[in-house]
């Protein structure tokens, strides 16, 4: 068993060996290395053909038309292109956007930028289980609302939003619906024929593809228009200029095809491991799951261990590659804004760990993780005066702490 054990699949996934092998055929002189936009010779034609196949594979994953797939550098760019692209194109119709407080920074910071440009953004508060109630979304809608951006699966707590209901509501009001599917594409079935979603952001490295590649689904019927954010040679039907990275696109396509074929078996195995992990640690006193346990993606478990400081717990769990918060924000010592939005206090938010399980996680690794977590919590609580006070029956909320 290789240490540390990788339990941070929500941050990134290793490239599946089958994907890596396929990608390697599109890089060197011996392979298909041409520019897909070179129309005058075979090197270009072969590369273009490979891109076309990959485009269809990504489209198949969400039951879309291949012409609705735009390749980008990842979900961050897809989110920027979708949100800014809609805002700038439809700004004559209205300048109001709705999103939620628990979105990824790539959505929140894009909305903040639009606020600086004169747009108005409503940030919806989730329930304690992490899910946005439909009536709250409907109440926020106005005549000048042009876009709703709600993620499919949350990156920190793994809860699943009812995107079918959100899509129905948006369509009935004539509002464009963008869904960040970085954490759900390849893990949950997505069908754009039944779900009324207009724009979907997809990430390669969250589904065993390479980093630096993603896609944006842009609905054709009814047609969604975007203002390009990257200008140049007019690639990707004018929506995203830049030479197409054939090897990465092929990798994304192959990853999508594998994810589609193996989704059901992968999910069943991963859910079993996730439940084994939770059943192995839930007996630890003052341990709580964050987010809804029923509407949750199979590989995700976000747990708060009360009276244990998150950073010291991370250090104690050095044999486990886990995170507190998401990789994009865990570099700062701020408590997770997602958990704060759920109503957790700073202490509980600080004592949370995100475990995310994936395709290559084994039962042996989960057994080792349970043992490590149990021992570490016991050891840290032995050293904690707060734990001692709690065990003595002192209500810590009533304690008058002296200020120095």
UniProtKB/Swiss-Prot annotation:
Q: What is its EC number?
A: 2.8.1.7
PROSITE patterns, alphabetized: AA_TRANSFER_CLASS_5 (PS00595)
Reactions this protein catalyses = (sulfur carrier)-H + L-cysteine = (sulfur carrier)-SH + L-alanine
GO molecular function terms listed in the Swiss-Prot or TrEMBL record: 2 iron, 2 sulfur cluster binding; cysteine desulfurase activity; metal ion binding; pyridoxal phosphate binding
Q: Which residues form a coiled coil?
A: none
* Cofactor (UniProt): pyridoxal 5'-phosphate
- What class does this enzyme belong to in the EC scheme? transferase
The pathway that the record names for this protein is: Cofactor biosynthesis; iron-sulfur cluster biosynthesis
Q: Mainly localized where?
A: cytoplasm
> Record keywords: Chaperone included?
no
Q: Which residues does [2Fe-2S] cluster bind?
A: 328
Sites of N6-(pyridoxal phosphate)lysine modification = 206
A Pfam family assignment: Aminotran_5
Secretion signal span = none
Give the protein family.
Belongs to the class-V pyridoxal-phosphate-dependent aminotransferase family. NifS/IscS subfamily.
Describe the function of this protein: Master enzyme that delivers sulfur to a number of partners involved in Fe-S cluster assembly, tRNA modification or cofactor biosynthesis. Catalyzes the removal of elemental sulfur atoms from cysteine to produce alanine. Functions as a sulfur delivery protein for Fe-S cluster synthesis onto IscU, an Fe-S scaffold assembly protein, as well as other S acceptor proteins.
**Subunit structure and binding partners:** Homodimer. Forms a heterotetramer with IscU, interacts with other sulfur acceptors.
Q: What is this protein called?
A: Cysteine desulfurase IscS
Recorded name of the encoding gene: iscS
């Amino acid at each position: 068993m290789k240490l540390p054990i990788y339990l941070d699949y929500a941050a990134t996934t290793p490239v599946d060996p089958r994907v890596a092998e396929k990608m390697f055929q599109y890089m060197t002189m011996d392979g298909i290395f041409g520019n897909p936009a070179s129309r005058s010779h075979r090197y270009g034609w072969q590369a273009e053909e490979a891109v076309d196949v990959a485009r269809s594979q990504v489209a198949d994953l969400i039951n879309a038309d291949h012409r609705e797939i735009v390749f980008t550098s990842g979900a961050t760019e897809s989110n920027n292109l979708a949100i800014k692209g809609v805002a700038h194109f439809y700004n004559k119709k209205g300048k109001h956007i709705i999103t939620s407080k628990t979105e990824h920074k790539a959505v929140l910071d894009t909305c903040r930028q639009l606020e600086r440009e004169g747009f108005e953004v409503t940030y919806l508060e989730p329930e304690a289980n992490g899910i946005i109630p439909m009536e709250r979304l409907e109440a926020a809608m106005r005549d000048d609302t042009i876009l709703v951006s709600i993620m499919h699966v949350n990156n920190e707590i793994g809860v699943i939003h009812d995107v079918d209901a959100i899509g129905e509501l948006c369509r009935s009001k004539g509002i464009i619906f963008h869904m960040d599917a970085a954490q759900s594409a390849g893990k949950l079935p997505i069908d754009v024929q039944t779900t009324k979603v207009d724009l979907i952001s997809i990430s390669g490295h969250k589904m065993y593809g390479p980093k630096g590649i993603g896609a944006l689904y842009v609905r054709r019927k009814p047609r969604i228009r975007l203002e390009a954010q990257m200008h140049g040679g007019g690639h990707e039907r004018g929506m995203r200029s830049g030479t197409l990275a054939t090897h990465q696109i092929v990798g994304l396509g192959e990853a999508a095809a594998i994810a589609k074929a193996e989704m059901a078996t992968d999910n069943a195995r991963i859910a079993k491991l996730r439940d084994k992990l939770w059943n192995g640690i839930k007996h630890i006193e003052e341990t709580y799951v964050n987010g809804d346990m029923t509407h949750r993606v199979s590989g995700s478990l976000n747990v708060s261990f009360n009276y244990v400081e998150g950073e010291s717990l991370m250090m104690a769990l050095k044999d486990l590659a886990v995170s507190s918060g998401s990789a994009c924000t865990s570099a700062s010592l701020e408590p997770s804004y997602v958990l704060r939005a759920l109503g957790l206090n700073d202490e509980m938010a600080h004592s949370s760990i995100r475990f995310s399980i994936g395709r290559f996680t084994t039962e042996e690794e989960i057994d080792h993780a349970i043992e490590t977590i149990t021992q570490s919590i016991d050891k840290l609580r032995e050293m904690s005066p707060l734990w001692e006070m709690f065990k003595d029956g002192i209500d810590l909320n009533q304690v008058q702490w002296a200020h120095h």
